[in-house]
From Swiss-Prot:
Organism name: Xylella fastidiosa (strain Temecula1 / ATCC 700964)
Pfam families the UniProt entry points to: RNA_pol_Rpb2_1 (PF04563), RNA_pol_Rpb2_2 (PF04561), RNA_pol_Rpb2_3 (PF04565), RNA_pol_Rpb2_45 (PF10385), RNA_pol_Rpb2_6 (PF00562), RNA_pol_Rpb2_7 (PF04560)
Transmembrane segments: none
InterPro entries given in the database record: DNA-dir_RNA_pol_bsu_external_1, DNA-dir_RNA_pol_su2, DNA-dir_RNAP_su2_dom, DNA-dir_RNAP_su2_hyb_sf, RNA_pol_bsu_bac, RNA_pol_bsu_CS, RNA_pol_bsu_protrusion, RNA_pol_Rpb2_2
Name under which the protein is recorded: DNA-directed RNA polymerase subunit beta
One of the GO BP terms on file: DNA-templated transcription
Length: 1388
């Protein structure tokens, strides 16, 4: 949205959208592919110096695996650094040759061998070497990867964040419906650790979801005794035992709450609590006020309490009672007898102090640390005999070693926050003070000195007990604070690390040999596992997807997609309703609208427009800071965790000119609730009304008037729009179209500003501004090659068209050329059609669409599809296949489109069944018929020993051959056609380089001319000393003689020398580049094993719109064309204009997508304004009048922020140019949730001199009579979707059959038949059509002999049929025999 002082770029001046937005956008829409591009850049760190690299990505993975030390410890392989080489082929060549676009990774490693004899580990020798570790795929600048010649996208994954989570079973486990609480520690890699309660309130633990053990076994394995465990988890009541009778309790009043005493509780004679009454909080306060420190209680009060420590007779050393045992009468007597003065008991009750760990200790069979570790060993490795070392090592490796366990930075941050610690950083392993204090190695001492008294496992168990006690809440796992994004870079790093770990194992074994045999690092490292892991991930991972390339929007959306599926994620079948649902925390992070319909609903989401990921991978969204009720322009990004504590106002909250909130109560969000708050309470405000939606949803105008289900369909169907022959900008847009087109990468944008020097259909040359030239070697020329008629992944056509003319002045970022579905740099997915909402003879029943023949004639929805057909010549056992024009038993006419090499000409128009590439295959020797013998005698060998296996045009396809590529294996002789293609390619490349050089050379000479004209000469060709250099003199001089000129002016001489060096350097560089390109073109191709030659033929198929094609608007209003009607029969307006499309009005009210009606009204107004401008231009109106009218359109209402278009910036020529572009309609922008109001639409209709109600009288095309009432008419942006009837229609007579059942295959791809199923059989039975049914079940299906005979009969003109035995009956017989039941068919 434009502010008053915005200056317009060259592209924007061509056509400005009238903006109805009322809220100034203070934040530009960020780069839409940033989530992909930034993530992979951080992974590669290719542009960072080796010493400056951070420990992430490739560098992090290499550092985590190296150094690799041999088993003996006498040799080590250390990592020094890495560098990425130059890719062998560029993106275009990779696409063409079916290769992967990547760069070689070379890692420098250092082999260190230590002296065995020396006691101090002295170094024996060091060898440093560069090792090749395979190809690393490179990302194209549009965020895609080219794998085996196809463009793929790695979709980001939304997975559960590492850390600790508390949950309960929602009462589903136990029949009583009791909530069983559990906690789970999830690391980034390593074993999962679960804690859970059982219905009897004992606490258990599981490791990696195996069988459960009492949690005390885990604590005992850490080295805690019973007393220490009880001391950690319980508060202790101390009782002093009187020598004769009675007990003194050290009183903590709070601990008595809820108890019922059997005696009066008194304070100096006054009774505080009577016997038999429950002690309440009020009583506790009284007790605290009275200051009583001890309470005399009878012995019975102590009975049944649990001891916190072992009670030992001091004189004899006898154990009187162990910790965690209950006190009874006998024990009290024994205590008195032994002279025990005091005992400690656990403070537990049934309300909020459960005796959970005490209960657990009672079912724990182990007594010592070793027993506990052995028990864990038995659970993890059942059946293996445990030894002391094995049990200790296994336990230590589970959670306490850096190699096997990694919580990750994110996990540690989440863990510490959840257990209530202040600091967020820490160690990636689980830490326990007791366990590490008892171990006496260097690593443990470091951890103890750093982390001190904390204990991760204890903190989790305490947290779980607190929640069970009713203090604390469980986590919501669907909250975005508990789900994080794993992007390309992180996934690639994990895969790379897995490959490196495989290498590490092999290297460890070889290192011991390196000590004795003097191996080099290259001999030690085998890079295959790394390369294989990376190839597998980019080629076949569930998240590596074939890019959706229907149109620019589908590309952008695919790259911004977030999937909950994939490795380490959910599965469709197991994902419940909660995971899929919209969550409060999605606001501003994930789109609440765009998600697929069907089994994946809610599991695949789209990133909201402004969302980004933070350093931990959590999604965050921007907000404007509000200070004391005033909105500032300061923007802060908050994640879902942080925004919980703030009050956030909506973007459309009313403010005055100073940003002060004007309403007395502001609608806000706070902790997931919607409420009204005074302005002083507000902390933040949304940055934009479209903050909650994704790019696709933000492209739907009047989205706020559509039902959510239909909006979802509208957002999804825009991605299926096929690029039309001529793109047409939407008359009613949302203002984000230009951003999407720019970021999608389909347009050509100027890298630097300058003047257009040359333009043709394939190339644009820009002479760069002097101010933007960098360095002395930069010639200041940018050359942009345009993509012409290339096939996309979805077989649509990618083509770029220049928008600029020679002499145009462009700035950096301006659009130089349009791509598919873009119009002057704006996304344009469909066409603006004149639409009427009315029934028409039943042709728009059930969402059908009635189309005017004019639309077909004008090619409004004609699309070009490019099909790639491949013919492969292989080496077979009987000999090699051959591509040639000499094919047996084929007529001359069938071969007339092939050249002598047997390959079709470019430009040939072909139809289904035509031969594209002639190919013959050797066939095995068989008995020759007499005729064949005769042919062989006449023509020699050839005629019979090969069969025709040519590539033909598939059924249902016709088109024009636009390109042929021939690939030949190295060492196989190239045919004539391959040489022709090669020569053409070399010529094209040579011309390209020559042109580039000429342009650069021209630019250098032009700059040199400006520096030397007017200077005095010392010496030179055809010029005397002392003369002045003039333009005519230079024009008559040979270019090479310029460098012989010498002047007095040192600066000019330097300029001449510099120009000469520049030209020589460029000449050398271009020669080198040309020879590289030439060798790439002429070298043999790397084909699959057994393939000798491959020919690819590209067909351009023109598809006009027809009955059966699917179309849709942007509001989920989809339909199928039912009829194409002559123009003269369509309803027409009073001025005779026939409508283009007739839609059913009943499709609107029940679907509740009213946005389409508003779009139609505003679109009509936009078109009407265009007509008014056209009339003014045709009448040659004064420029001032035109300026005034445009001002009235754009700058009428000052309440609209977007309405301040500064027309004074436009010169008269620019204004006229813009007016010409507006004659087709003045484009409008109605931003999402901030769109045009009813009054504004009415005003636009008035200004366009159209009825303000948006309805007009239509007349019947058949009779010319007016219809009974007025009709809603207007312009809607309508799309043709990639569900074309041509792709679906299919017919078969005979074709392939299934091997076992001998029934025809199914589906168009297999050239299958239509299944005559069970229900269809019932229908024929009901009609009594017995012979038809017999035919269906036998000769038309799987009666093999019958159908062959039938074929012969039809050829002979005999229409009889003999039904035999269906093959499926034989299959049934065989299957029953496999059950050992014999069935035989007897002839009766």
């Amino acid at each position: 949205m434009k502010d008053l002082m915005t200056s317009y770029s060259f592209t924007e001046k061509k056509r400005i959208r009238k903006d109805f937005g009322k809220h100034r956008s203070i934040l530009k829409v960020p780069f839409l592919l940033a989530i992909q591009v930034d993530s992979y850049r951080a992974f590669l760190q290719g542009d960072v110096e080796s010493s400056q690299r951070k420990d992430i990505g490739l560098h992090g993975a290499l550092k985590s695996v190296f150094p690799i030390v041999s088993y003996s410890g006498n040799a080590a392989l250390e990592y020094v650094g890495y560098k990425l080489g130059e890719p062998m082929f560029d993106e275009r060549e990779c696409r063409q040759r079916g290769m992967s676009y990547g760069a070689p990774l070379r890692v420098t490693v250092r082999l260190v061998i230590y002296d065995r004899e020396s006691s101090t580990k002295a170094v024996k020798y060091i060898k440093e070497q560069e090792v090749y570790l395979g190809e690393i795929p490179l990302m194209t600048e549009n965020g895609t990867f080219i794998v085996n010649g196809t463009e793929r996208v790695i979709v980001s994954q939304l997975h559960r964040s590492p850390g600790v989570f508390f949950d309960h079973d929602r009462g589903k486990t136990h029949s009583s419906g009791k909530l069983l609480y559990s906690a789970r520690i999830i690391p980034c890699r390593g074993s999962w650790l679960d804690f859970e309660f059982d219905p009897k309130d004992a606490l258990f633990t599981r490791i990696d979801r195996r069988r459960k053990l009492p949690v005390s076994i885990l604590l005992r394995a850490l080295g805690y005794s019973n007393e220490e465990i009880l001391g950690e988890f319980f508060e202790i009541n101390t009782f002093h035992i009187n020598p004769d009778e009675g007990v003194q309790l050290e009183l903590v009043p709070e601990r008595l709450r809820g108890e019922i005493l059997s005696f009066n509780l008194t304070d100096g004679g006054s009774v505080i609590v009577e016997a038999g009454k429950r002690i309440t909080a009020r009583h506790v306060k009284q007790l605290e006020a009275s200051g009583i420190s001890a309470l005399a209680v009878p012995d019975e009060y102590l009975i049944g309490r649990i001891l916190s420590h072992d009670v030992i007779d001091a004189t004899t050393g006898e154990l009187l009672a162990s910790a965690n045992s209950e006190v009874n009468e006998d024990r009290i007597i024994a205590f008195r007898k032994a002279g025990i003065e005091s005992v400690g008991t656990l403070w537990v009750n049934d309300l909020d102090r459960g005796a959970y760990l005490s209960n657990t200790l009672r079912i724990d069979p182990t007594r010592t640390q070793l027993e506990a570790q052995v028990e864990i060993y038995r659970m993890m490795r059942p059946g293996e005999p445990p030894t002391k070392e094995a049990a200790q090592n296994l336990f230590h490796n589970l959670f306490f070693t850096f190699d096997r366990y990694d919580l990750s930075m994110v996990g540690r941050m989440k863990f510490n926050r959840r257990v209530g610690r202040k600091e967020v950083a820490g160690e990636p392993v689980l830490y326990d003070k007791k366990y590490f204090s008892d171990r006496n190695d260097e690593e443990s001492r470091r951890l103890v000195s750093k982390l001190g008294e904390t204990s991760d496992i204890l903190d989790v168990i305490k947290g779980l007990c607190e929640i069970r006690n009713g203090r604390g809440v469980v986590d919501d796992i669907d909250h975005l604070g508990n789900r994080r994004v794993r992007s390309v870079g992180e996934m690639a790093e994990n895969v790379f690390r897995v490959g490196l770990v495989r290498v590490e194992r092999a290297v460890k074994e070889r290192l011991s040999m390196a000590e004795s045999e003097g191996l080099t690092p290259q001999e030690l490292i085998n890079a295959k596992p790394v390369a294989a892991a990376i190839k597998e991930f980019f080629g076949s991972s569930q998240l590596s997807q074939f890019m959706d390339q229907n149109n620019p929007l589908s590309e952008v959306t695919h790259k911004r997609r977030l999937s909950a599926l994939g490795p380490g994620g959910l599965t469709r079948e197991r994902a419940g309703f909660e995971v899929r649902d919209v969550h409060l925390s999605h606001y501003g992070c994930l789109c609440t609208i765009e998600t697929p319909e069907g089994p994946n609903i809610g599991l695949i989401n789209s990133l909201a427009v402004f969302a980004r990921t933070n350093q931990y991978g959590f999604l965050e969204t921007p907000y404007r800071k509000v200070v004391e009720g005033r909105v500032t322009d300061e923007v802060e990004y908050l994640s879902a965790i942080e925004e919980n504590q703030y009050v956030i106002a909506q973007a459309n909250t009313l403010t005055d000119d100073n940003g002060q909130l004007t309403e007395s109560f502001v609608p806000c969000r706070f902790q997931g609730e919607s409420l009204l708050k005074p302005p002083s309470y507000v902390h933040y405000m949304d940055v934009s009304p479209m903050q909650t939606v994704s790019v696709a949803a933000a492209l739907v105008p009047f989205l706020e008037h559509d039902d959510a289900n239909r909006a979802l369909m509208g957002a999804n169907m825009q991605r299926q729009a096929v690029p039309t022959l001529r793109a047409q900008k939407p008359l009613v847009g949302t203002g984000i179209e230009r951003t999407v087109a720019r970021d999608s990468g389909v347009t050509v944008n100027a890298r630097r500003g300058g003047v257009i020097d040359q333009v043709d259909a394939g190339r644009i040359v820009v002479k760069v501004n002097e101010s933007e030239i960098i360095g002395a070697t930069d010639a200041g020329v940018d050359i942009y090659g345009l993509i012409k008629y290339t096939r996309s992944n979805q077989n649509t056509c990618i083509n770029q068209r220049p928008l600029v003319n020679v002499g145009d002045i462009v700035a950096s970022g301006d659009v130089l050329a349009d791509g598919p579905s873009t119009d002057i740099g704006e996304l344009a997915l469909g066409q603006n059609m004149l639409i009427a909402f009315m029934p028409w003879n039943g042709y728009n029943f059930e969402d059908s669409i009635l189309l005017s023949e004019r639309v077909v004639e004008e090619d409004r929805y004609t699309t070009i599809h490019i099909e790639e057909l491949t013919c492969i010549a292989r080496d077979t056992k009987l000999g090699s296949e051959e591509i040639s024009a000499d094919i047996p038993n084929v007529s001359e006419q069938a071969l007339n489109r092939l050249d002598e090499s047997g390959v079709v000409y470019i430009g040939a128009e072909v139809r289904a069944g035509d031969i594209l590439v002639g190919k013959v295959t050797p066939k095995g020797e068989s008995q020759l018929t007499p005729e064949e013998k005769l042919l062989r005698a006449i023509f020699g060998e050839k005629a019979s020993d090969v069969k025709d296996s040519s590539l033909r045009v598939p059924p249902g396809m016709d088109g024009t051959v636009i390109d042929v590529q021939v690939f030949t294996r190295d060492g196989i002789e190239k045919d004539k056609r391959a040489h022709q293609i090669e020569e053409y390619e070399i010529k094209r490349v040579k011309k390209d380089f020559d042109d580039q050089f000429r342009i650069l050379e021209g630019a250098i000479y032009a700059r040199l001319r400006s520096q030397i004209v007017g200077k005095v000469v010392n010496s030179g060709v055809d010029i005397k000393k002392g003369e002045v250099i003039t333009d005519p003199y230079l024009d008559g001089l040979k270019k090479s003689d310029w460098f012989a000129l010498r002047m007095k002016d040192e600066v000019a001489v330097e300029a001449i020398d510099r120009a000469q060096k520049q030209i020589q350097a460029y000449q050398k560089e271009f020669d080198q580049r040309f020879s590289d390109k030439r060798s790439k073109i002429t070298q043999g191709d790397d084909l699959a094993p057994g393939v000798l030659k491959m020919v690819k033929v590209f067909l351009a198929v023109k598809r006009c719109i027809q009955c059966g094609d699917k179309m849709a608007g942007r509001h989920g209003n989809k339909g199928v064309i039912s009829n194409v009607v002559p123009v003269e029969d369509m309803p027409f307006m009073e001025d005779g204009t026939p409508v283009d499309i007739v839609l059913n009005p009943l499709g609107v009210p029940s679907r509740m997508n009213i946005g389409q009606i508003l779009e139609v009204h505003l679109g009509w107004a936009a078109k009407g304004l265009g007509h008014r401008i056209q009339r003014m231009l045709e009448a040659n109106a004064a420029i001032a009048d035109l300026r005034k009218f445009l001002n009235e359109i754009y700058n009428h209402d000052k309440s609209l922020v977007g309405e301040r278009v500064d027309l004074s910036q436009f010169s008269d020529d620019e204004l006229l140019n813009m007016a010409k572009n507006l004659t087709d309609g003045v484009p409008m922008a109605s931003p999402v949730f901030d769109g045009a109001s009813e009054q504004e639409i009415k005003r636009m209709l008035d200004l366009a001199e159209l009825p303000a109600g948006g309805q007009t009288q239509l007349y019947d095309g058949h009779t010319g009579e007016p219809f009974d009432r007025k009709t809603t008419v207007g312009y809607m942006h309508y799309l043709k979707l990639n569900h074309l009837v041509d792709d679906k229609m299919h017919a078969r007579s005979t074709g392939p059959y299934s091997l076992v059942t001998q029934q025809p295959l199914g589906g168009k791809a297999q050239f299958g038949g239509q299944r005559f199923g069970e229900m269809e059989v019932w229908a024929l039975e009901a009609y009594g059509a017995a012979y038809t049914l017999q035919e269906m079940l036998t000769v038309k299906s799987d009666d093999v002999q019958g159908r062959n005979q039938m074929y012969k009969n039809i050829v002979d003109g005999d229409h009889q049929m003999v039904a035999g035995m269906p093959e499926s009956f034989n299959v049934l017989v065989k299957e029953i025999r496999s059950l050992a039941i014999n069935i035989e068919l007897e002839d009766n």
